[in-house]
Regions:
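Surface-exposed, extracytoplasmic segments of Gram-negative outer-membrane nutrient-acquisition systems
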Residues: 485-504
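A beta-strand-loop signature enriched in Asp, Gly, Thr, and Trp
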Residues: 494-497, 537-575
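Mobile, glycine-rich extracellular loop/lid and propeptide segments
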Residues: 140-490, 508-539, 569-576, 585-594, ...
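Intrinsic-disorder/low-complexity coil detector
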Residues: 16-17, 23, 33, 55, ...
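Sec-dependent N-terminal signal peptides
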Residues: 1-5
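Short, intrinsically disordered, charge-balanced linker/junction segments flanking boundaries
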Residues: 134-137, 557, 581-582, 590
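Short, contiguous acidic/charged loop-to-helix segments that flank catalytic cores in large enzymes
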Residues: 503-505, 551-564, 592-597, 623-628
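Ser/Thr-rich, Pro/Gly/Ala-heavy low-complexity intrinsically disordered linkers and tails
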Residues: 7-139
C-alpha cells in the first residue's frame, strides 16, 4: 500500500505521538486516497497532508482506502519466484579464491583497507564523488548503509557544520520530530539532493515495526511524508508478526521486541539505481513470511520482480533437519543484521529470537537486479545456532570483496575440523554461486561463554581502513583485534595466535553491543567503544594494536537491579571534517538509567569531543525541550549535513541542529 501524502509532522514534541505506544496494531496513517494497485506501486493522490492519529485498524486513515494497493507488494504468497537460484550449499572450506575485484557499494573503485560506500574513502558518509548518480548529490554527504560504509566505520568525515563549538552553543538542540506508525529498529538512512517529483530534496528514510517505509524531507519540520508504503492489510489477514507468536517458542514469554515484528533491520540503498532494499516480515492468515523488497527511493514503488520470498535450504544434519537438509524458518529466524550491498549482491544475515527453536545462522545473497537468490551460507549445518545478528550491524566488506561477520551462541566443531561456526568471526568470499569460508577465529573459551550467553556475535566487525585489522566485541566484555590475513582459527590452549585481546569492562561481564567506530585524525588513529555500565573509551591504534588513550567521565547507565546489567551501553556515530584536528565528535545514544533488555526505556543523546572523550559537550537531558522519548535499542544516530537524526521507540524520530527553541 503506497501513500504519497500522509501524516503531519509533530513539532518539537517530547511526548509519544497519539497511539504510538498504546495502539496494539500500529496502523499506518495517510491522507489521500490510494487506488488499488499491484505491489503497492500505484497510488492516486487525493487530499493530501491531512493530520491523522495512528489508525488502530492498521490501514489507511483520513480518507485513504483501507484496502488500497495489493498487500505486500504483490500476491500474498510471494508474487515473483521464491528466491530464484538453487540452494548454494552450506559453505565451502577453501583457500583464498581468485580476486573478484573491489567494486565498492555505489560503483566506486576500492581503496586500501576496504571499499568505501559510493566513493567515500576510509570511512565516513558517502559523498558519491566516484560516479555520477543522477539526482543524488556528488558533493553533499549521504548515508546509504548501516554505519556509513562497507568497513562499518560509523564515521561521517564530511561534516563541517557540526563542530565542538557549535554543539556547545546555546542554539544547538532539538529542532523537530516526525511521527511514524511504530518503533524504529533500522538506522535512519539519508540521501542528499534527491530528485523527488522534479524538486531536489535532502531525504531521510525510516522503516518501522509496523512494516512501513517512510520518506521525509530532511529539513522541513512541517511537511507530510514525501511517500509512505505499508505492507500490511489487516482486513485481509495480513499483519506484522507479533511477540505472542513467539512466546513458548523463543523464551517462555518473548519480550526482546515489545509488540510487533515488522521491519527489524537497516535497509541499504544503491544510489546509482535509486533503489532501497529491505526485508519485511508479515503474518498472512497464520502463515509467516519474510520478503526482500526493492523500492524506488524517489516514490516508494516496487522494482520489477519485487518482492521475493526469503527461502533457503542446504545439506545438513543439524537441529531441525529433514531428509538431511536444514531450512530457513520465517518465524524463528530473526533477520536483525543490517543489509549489505556489494558487487551487485544484496546480503541478509539471520539470527534467532532468544535462541529459541531449531534455528541456524544464515547469510543469503540476492542479485540486486533480478532479485534471484545467488548464494547461501549456513553457519551450523550439522549443529545448532550460530545466529548472525550483530546487534543490528551489517556484514563488513573489504577492498578485495571479502565479507566479515560474527556469529552468536551455537555449536563450533572447529577443533575437529568440522564446518559449524557458532561463536566465531567468519571471513567469506563470493565465488560463482557459492560463499567460501576462507578463514575464521573461534575463542578458546567458546564452550564456556556459550553456556553463559556471552557470545562473540554481539557486535559486528569493524575493518580498519589503514591496516589489515578487523575488530569486534563480545558479551564477555572483550574486544578482539584480528589480522585479516590470518584471523587465527582455533587454538585449544589460549588466544595467543591473534593480534590482541582487550578487556574493556571491569570483570569481563558487561556486554559490548555497539560495534566500535573509527577515526583517523591529524593526531592519530582512534577506535571508540561504549560497553554496558562502562565509560566511553577511546583507544589509539599503534602498530596495529589498541592502546587506551581516554575514558569519559560519563558511564552508560548502571542498573543495580539484581541479575541485570544495563543494556545496550552506547551505540555510536562519529563525525568530523576529514582528519582536521578538533573537528571530531562522538554521538552516543544510551538509556537514561534503566536496562533496555526486554523492555522499552527512556533514552538520551550524548555528544563527546572525539579528540578527548573525557569532555562531554552536550546531552539531550540538559533541557526538557531536547528529550526524544524512548531509546531505539542498538540503533545509532544518523548525523549528516549539520543535523543529527535520532530514531526512537516512541513512534517518531527527532532532528537536532542549530536553531533550537529554548523554553
Amino acid at each position: 500500500m503506497l501513500f504519497l501524502a500522509g501524516v503531519s509532522s509533530l513539532m518539537c514534541s517530547n511526548q509519544t505521538p497519539p497511539g504510538a505506544s498504546q495502539d496494539p496494531t500500529g496502523g499506518a496513517a495517510s491522507g489521500g486516497s490510494p487506488a488499488a494497485g499491484n505491489g503497492g506501486s500505484t497510488a492516486a493522490v487525493g487530499a493530501g497532508g491531512a493530520t491523522s492519529a495512528l489508525n488502530p485498524e492498521g490501514g489507511a486513515a483520513n480518507g485513504g482506502a483501507a484496502n488500497g494497493g495489493a498487500a505486500n507488494g504483490g500476491a500474498a504468497n510471494g508474487g515473483a519466484a521464491n528466491g530464484g537460484a538453487a540452494d548454494g550449499g552450506a559453505g565451502i572450506e577453501a583457500g583464498a579464491p581468485a580476486d573478484l575485484g573491489g567494486t565498492s557499494f555505489g560503483g566506486a573503485s576500492s581503496a586500501a583497507g576496504g571499499a568505501a560506500s559510493a566513493g567515500a574513502a576510509n570511512g565516513g558518509a558517502a559523498s558519491g564523488g566516484a560516479a555520477p548518480m543522477g539526482g543524488v548529490s556528488a558533493t553533499s554527504a549521504s548515508v546509504f548503509t548501516r554505519s556509513n560504509d562497507l568497513q562499518r566505520s560509523g564515521s561521517n568525515l564530511k561534516e563541517s557544520v557540526l563542530t565542538p563549538a557549535v554543539v556547545r552553543s546555546a542554539g544547538f538542540g532539538k529542532l523537530f520530530c516526525k511521527p511514524v506508525d511504530d518503533e524504529i529498529y533500522g538506522q535512519l538512512l539519508y540521501v542528499s539532493a534527491l530528485d523527488v517529483g522534479g524538486q531536489k530534496r535532502d531525504v531521510v528514510f525510516a522503516v518501522t515495526m509496523n512494516d512501513s517505509v517512510y520518506a521525509f524531507d530532511a529539513n522541513d519540520a512541517e511537511a507530510a511524508p514525501l511517500w509512505h508504503v505499508n505492507y500490511t492489510d489487516p482486513k485481509k489477514g495480513i499483519t506484522p508478526v507479533s511477540t505472542g507468536d513467539l512466546s513458548g517458542l523463543a523464551c517462555s514469554q518473548y519480550r526482546d521486541f515489545s509488540r510487533q515484528i515488522g521491519i527489524t533491520s537497516t535497509p541499504v540503498i544503491d544510489p546509482n539505481t535509486f533503489t532501497m532494499y529491505l526485508n519485511a516480515r508479515t503474518k498472512e492468515n497464520g502463515v509467516f513470511v519474510q520478503r526482500l523488497h526493492a523500492l524506488d527511493i524517489r516514490n516508494g514503488e516496487e522494482r520489477p520482480g519485487s518482492p521475493v520470498k526469503l527461502e533457503a535450504s542446504v545439506p545438513g544434519t543439524g537441529t531441525g533437519s529433514v531428509d538431511a537438509k536444514i531450512s530457513l524458518d520465517p518465524l524463528l529466524n530473526n533477520q536483525r543484521a543490517g543489509l549489505a550491498l556489494h558487487d551487485n549482491t544484496v546480503y541478509l544475515g539471520f539470527g534467532s529470537h532468544c535462541d529459541g527453536g531449531s534455528y541456524h545462522g544464515w547469510l543469503l545473497g540476492y542479485d540486486a537486479r533480478s532479485l534471484s537468490r545467488v548464494v547461501t551460507y549456513a553457519t551450523t549445518p550439522n549443529g545448532w545456532g550460530g545466529g548472525i545478528w550483530m546487534s543490528g550491524m551489517a556484514p563488513a566488506v573489504d577492498g578485495e570483496g571479502f565479507i566479515y561477520l560474527t556469529t552468536a551462541n551455537g555449536s563450533a566443531d572447529v577443533a575437529s575440523g568440522g564446518g559449524d561456526r557458532g561463536q566465531s568471526f567468519v571471513k567469506l568470499k563470493r565465488q560463482a554461486q557459492a560463499l567460501l569460508v576462507v578463514d575464521w577465529f573461534t575463542p578458546v573459551d567458546w564452550s564456556v561463554t556459550n553456556l553463559e550467553d556471552r557470545d562473540v556475535g554481539s557486535t559486528g566487525a569493524l575493518l580498519l581502513p589503514s591496516s589489515n585489522r578487523v575488530i569486534g566485541g563480545s558479551k564477555e566484555g572483550v574486544l578482539y583485534v584480528l589480522d585479516t590475513n590470518d584471523l587465527g582459527k582455533f587454538n585449544e590452549n589460549d588466544n595467543a595466535q591473534i593480534v590482541q585481546t582487550v578487556p574493556v569492562t571491569g570483570e569481563r561481564r558487561s556486554h559490548i553491543h555497539g560495534t566500535p567506530v573509527y577515526w583517523k585524525s591529524a593526531g592519530g588513529e582512534y577506535v571508540y567503544v561504549m560497553p554496558e555500565e562502562e565509560h566511553l573509551q577511546q583507544y589509539q591504534v599503534k602498530e596495529g594494536k589498541l592502546i587506551l588513550a581516554h575514558e569519559s567521565e560519563v558511564t552508560s547507565p548502571v542498573d543495580h537491579h539484581a541479575a541485570s546489567t544495563t543494556m545496550p551501553g552506547g551505540i555510536l556515530t562519529l563525525t568530523a571534517n576529514g582528519g582536521v584536528a578538533g573537528s571530531g565528535l562522538i554521538w552516543a545514544t544510551t538509556p537514561i538509567a534503566q536496562d533496555a533488555n526486554q523492555q522499552v526505556v527512556s533514552g538520551v543523546l550524548r555528544v563527546f569531543d572525539a579528540n578527548d572523550v573525557t569532555r562531554e559537550l552536550w546531552n539531550s537531558e540538559q533541557s526538557a525541550n531536547d528529550s526524544f522519548g524512548n531509546l531505539a535499542k542498538f540503533n545509532p544516530p544518523t548525523v549528516v549535513n549539520g543535523r543529527a537524526y535520532v530514531p526512537t521507540f516512541s513512534g517518531q524520530f527527532c532532528v537536532y541542529g542549530v536553531g533550537a527553541t529554548r523554553r
